[in-house]
Regions:
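C-terminal subregion of chymotrypsin/trypsin-like serine protease catalytic domains
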Residues: 3-6, 22-28, 68-81, 90, ...
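N-terminal activation segment of mature serine protease catalytic domains
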Residues: 31-57
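A conserved glycine-rich beta-strand in the N-terminal activation segment of trypsin-fold
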Residues: 50-71, 102
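Structural detector of coil-to-beta-strand junctions
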Residues: 50-52, 90, 137, 193, ...
Length: 259
């Protein structure tokens, strides 16, 4: 297999693992029962996260997470929105309940990183909201902090490793840390973060894609990553580290679009 073919295979397998619902049903509207955006081993959100976004189909079904980085821009995973038209995507911003609260708004533009699908490690996209929202955006960190840095993951969904439970309505959170890139399989260390699975049984899973990985400033949060895929190529969630798009490393491309 050529290098290009190998990279395409890795990217396709990764997208199928963590974002299978978003990618496979881009032209349809999945029922809630088929969506498995989860954090295994997490807990109900202990605070409000005004920047947290639930990306939804027109029928209100959640399919991916995202982070509000400007009053009218959201960063998410590219595999979440590839093949989707803005008219078929809406966003609920600033609620810990994926079914109510916050601000519900349509979207007007989807921008996929130009290297996504061509090179490993660019699973990042931007979604422009149809109108600005009043929630406070999250700043992008100037540095991811490197291995050992404590981080927090956010997401909705089934908390069972095999995806057999129903998705919770309440936002889940999990405290973890960045680990060396060598701990993850098929990772681009220049543009991605390898993130630990605490206790060997906690972490992100199917459809949790696009949701934020946060770094604490001591008094608030900064964005360092966006959920991408499994780091051990296993179909069972939380059995190994997870891979996150390194938003700090791609901040130049992001700023070029959102200003």
């Amino acid at each position: 297999m050529t290098l290009r073919g190998a990279l395409a295979a890795v990217i396709a397998a990764a997208a199928a693992f963590l974002g299978s619902t978003a990618v496979a049903t881009a032209s349809t509207e999945p029922e809630d029962s088929t969506v498995r955006p989860l954090i295994v081993g997490g807990e109900d959100a202990t605070q409000t996260y005004p920047f947290m976004v639930s990306l939804q189909r027109a029928n209100g079904s959640h399919f991916c997470g995202g982070s509000l980085i400007r009053e009218d821009w959201v960063v998410t995973a590219a595999h979440c929105v590839t093949g989707s038209a803005p008219s078929g995507v809406r966003a609920r911003v600033g609620s810990v309940d994926r079914t109510s609260g916050g601000t519900l708004v349509g979207t007007s533009q989807i921008v996929i990183h130009p290297s996504y699908g061509q090179r490993l490690g660019y699973d990042i996209a931007l979604v422009r909201l149809a109108s600005p929202v009043g929630q406070e955006p999250i700043p992008i960190a100037t540095s991811d902090g490197g291995p050992g840095t404590p981080t927090r993951l956010l997401g909705w969904g089934d908390a069972c490793p095999a995806g057999q439970c129903g998705p919770p309505v309440t936002l889940q959170q999990l405290d973890t840390r960045i680990v060396p890139a060598t701990s993850c399989w098929g990772i681009n260390a220049a543009t991605e973060l390898c993130t630990d699975n605490p206790g060997g049984n906690a972490g992100a899973c199917y459809g949790d894609s696009g949701g934020p990985q946060l770094r604490s400033t001591g008094s608030d949060w900064e964005l360092v990553g966006a959920t991408s895929r499994s780091g051990n190529n296993s179909p069972v969630c939380a059995t190994g580290p997870s891979i996150y798009g390194n938003v700090t490393a791609l901040a130049g491309w992001i700023d070029g679009h959102v200003g």
